[in-house]
Amino acid sequence: MGLLEKIFGTYSDREVKRIIPLVDKIDALDGSMQALSEDELKAKTAEFKQRYENGETLDDLLVEAFAVVREASSRILGLKHFREQIIGGIVLHQGRISEMKTGEGKTLVATLPSYLNAITGKGVHVVTVNDYLAKRDMEWMGQLYQYLGLTTGVIVHDLDQKQRQEAYAADITYGTNNEFGFDYLRDNMVIYKEERVQRPLHFCIVDEVDSILIDEARTPLIISGEGEKSTEFYKVADNFAKMLRKEKDFTIDEKTNSAILTDEGVEKAEKYYHIDNYADPQNMEIQHHTSQALKANYLMKRDKDYMVKEDEVVIVDEFTGRLMEGRRYSDGLHQAIEAKEGVKVQKESKTLATITFQNYFRMYEKLSGMTGTALTEEVEFREIYGLDVVVIPTHRPIARIDAPDIVYKTELGKFKAVVEDIVETNKNGQPVLVGTVSIEKSELLSSLLKKRGVRHQVLNAKYHEQEAEIISHAGEKGMVTIATNMAGRGTDIKLGEGVTDVGGLKIIGTERHESRRIDNQLRGRAGRQGDKGYSRFYVSLEDDLMRIFGSDKLKNMVEKLGLGDDDAIESKMVSSAIENAQKKVEGNNFDIRKTLIQYDDVMNKQREIIYKQRSEVLEGENLKDQIEGMIKDLIYNAVNSHISGVDEELESDIEAILNYLDDICLPRGIVEVEELATMSNDEIKEKLYSLAKEIYERKEEEFSSDQMRELERVILLRVVDTKWMDHIDSMEHLKQGIGLRAYKQQDPTQAYQMEGSDMFEEMVENIKVETVRYLFHVQAERAPERQRVVKETEINYSGPDAGDTKKEPVRRKEKKIGRNDLCPCGSGKKYKDCCGRRA
């Protein structure tokens, strides 16, 4: 702590001081609230709603509303909010992040701002990390809200559309970040406005906010359809990768987590693939497949990054150690791993809609969050989300002892020491929770403990069904629990009888994570609500963090001391070296996320424009003016771009205009070149536009006026959706190749912004051309029907990419229209003979 902080207190101390007077006012209402009858207390909600409608603000109502929730909670749940919990609730209502230590009752804290903000009738979303917690919190806290006359809903994976609409219509809706994000994307793919499920995004409380807004910030949510590419080439590239020798044919850069061919490797590739120049842009696909095959074979580790289960490759979440069933790595990496493991290689998919969590959560009118560990990422929360972090004081002083790290030379020496520590601790009945970084390490430790005859439970991706159950017993006397990373987060570990007498829960970390926050989360499992507890990390110089990012100074010191495998050192220098290594990685990851958001912002602005236009099409009763505007733009642009201004070329220019418009909206023969050649440019535009309008009026007579309006909607929706999907793919390709611009002294992000903008404008022009073309060619054979461009069939989600510590896309899969299906434009023809011909 610096001198200024000692004198003035930290930022959080000062913010908490400002909130204390409000807490005192809420406290002062305690007696009068207790005196209210059941009916009087319940009637308060209707009173608050009326006062809000009459012009009072939520801040005006805060003191009374919080006091009402506190009293109702005491009566219904038997839990009365502590002063510290009220401070946390006020911070959340203000649209900030409450950092509250584990066991301080975050679930109860959220009831205060949720109730207050639900008074507006605009809905409150409470976001949790998994379906189990969403259901648990909704059922538990729902009793309180229902008592006070508010409705609650929960969004879980297997709900149908009607159930989702009901859940979102509730005053307070619980659910996971994935479900909220997917519903937003799906709402922007509907073909009838009645199919939408979400209301406008009003107020959101994100539980475990660091996990969702930092760890998963770069995870794109993707809804995808099946691609057409063959999967055979993955096997060809896999055979090539398996022939290579490390260091000679390729090198591995562990800091960026990438594998690169050497000159010798490039020569081998040219021979193997029968090509002259591996680096030639024509061979981009070969480079891509080879790069993914190298990644799959030499960077992705089985039982750490993924598991093979029932002949399928299943991703393991690096943050929680859970299996991510049905999720897939994008960009062909999943197929490359399938080829490596010899299981069926599935087809790549085509992206239909996508958004990152960063951009989804920034759309809420007010965003807030709570977690036990946010302060280390305070700068990122402030810069990217405009959220500040306020550390809430604990209800009772923390009694946990955090011992300094112990460092061993080798990993084996470290694990031997961990086992000895567990055996000794277990003798006196003190419960132990051991944190590991992977399934592989959990199982290694488990086998070592079995040899010593120590009874224990293993909690990792293989058994996550019993996760909450196992973790809730971890504080009982004599229990030894091994847990991967942050598995079981959100479930309290309560101490069993007699455990306080033997020192409380003991936490042993078997490796430092690259993020200090995740280490702090593991520590925070012990010593909840002033309980006794103890934590210590065991580290070896062979651990990934120390090997890749550790300082040479530390390694040299260990060499000089001549440490044996089983010898250990414990010093402040070691702890600070570890912390510096972690800061290095955190800083690096923050920079990557900042750069990526610059890229993503380009796509985000474009997405907003397209979704806004789509929404107007769904909502609008009459698109006729918009369609006529498109016809006008199209004709005016055609004239401007074709007429050169050279008199001798005028007739051939007009000929070219008529040829161009013939396929779109003006059949040849409707006007002669000679007639137009006598006119000025403006007169030509007006003449062609009036002719096109006449044809369109006649087209309207073939249908009824209502049918024509519906037809306009059907075709415009279809064209916008198809062009937008293609544009998403094009932007993804642009992003993948843009990094090379740095070699041309170009700023890649600027180049991406400019070229992405040009591509978007081109797409908008193409939407106009295609829409007008379809409308002028459609036949009056049957009433127009809206159909989806794709149908949703399964869910796909991907975890962390081997390439650069980034999280990979959450995917949901959808099916394309078959060539022989009826065309969705309503013509009555087969898709291949109608719109499919031009697709």
UniProtKB/Swiss-Prot annotation:
Complex formation: Monomer and homodimer. Part of the essential Sec protein translocation apparatus which comprises SecA, SecYEG and auxiliary proteins SecDF. Other proteins may also be involved.
Superkingdom of source: Bacteria
InterPro entries, alphabetized: Helicase_ATP-bd (IPR014001), Helicase_C-like (IPR001650), P-loop_NTPase (IPR027417), SEC_C_motif (IPR004027), SecA (IPR000185), SecA_CS (IPR020937), SecA_DEAD (IPR011115), SecA_motor_DEAD (IPR014018)
EC number: 7.4.2.8
Function in brief: Part of the Sec protein translocase complex. Interacts with the SecYEG preprotein conducting channel. Has a central role in coupling the hydrolysis of ATP to the transfer of proteins into and across the cell membrane, serving as an ATP-driven molecular motor driving the stepwise translocation of polypeptide chains across the membrane.
Biological processes, Gene Ontology terms: intracellular protein transmembrane transport; protein import; protein targeting; protein transport by the Sec complex
Stretches of the chain forming a coiled coil according to its record: none
Membrane topology: Peripheral membrane protein
Subcellular location, record wording: Cell membrane; Cytoplasm
Protein name: Protein translocase subunit SecA
Gene Ontology molecular functions: ATP binding; metal ion binding; protein-exporting ATPase activity
Taxon lineage: Bacteria, Bacillati, Bacillota, Clostridia, Eubacteriales
Keyword Methyltransferase tagged: no
Family: Belongs to the SecA family.
Binding annotation for Zn(2+): C823, C825, C834, C835
Catalytic activity: ATP + H2O + cellular proteinSide 1 = ADP + phosphate + cellular proteinSide 2
Binding positions (ATP): Q85, G103, E104, G105, K106, T107, D492
Cofactor binding notes: May bind 1 zinc ion per subunit.
Cofactor(s) the record lists: Zn(2+)
HAMAP family recorded: SecA (MF_01382)
The keyword Iron-sulfur appears for this protein: no
CDD domains: DEXDc_SecA, SF2_C_secA
Record's GO cellular component terms: cell envelope Sec protein transport complex; cytosol; plasma membrane
Keywords for the protein's UniProt record, in alphabetical order: ATP-binding, Cell membrane, Cytoplasm, Membrane, Metal-binding, Nucleotide-binding, Protein transport, Translocase, Translocation, Transport, Zinc
Region span, Disordered: 794-820
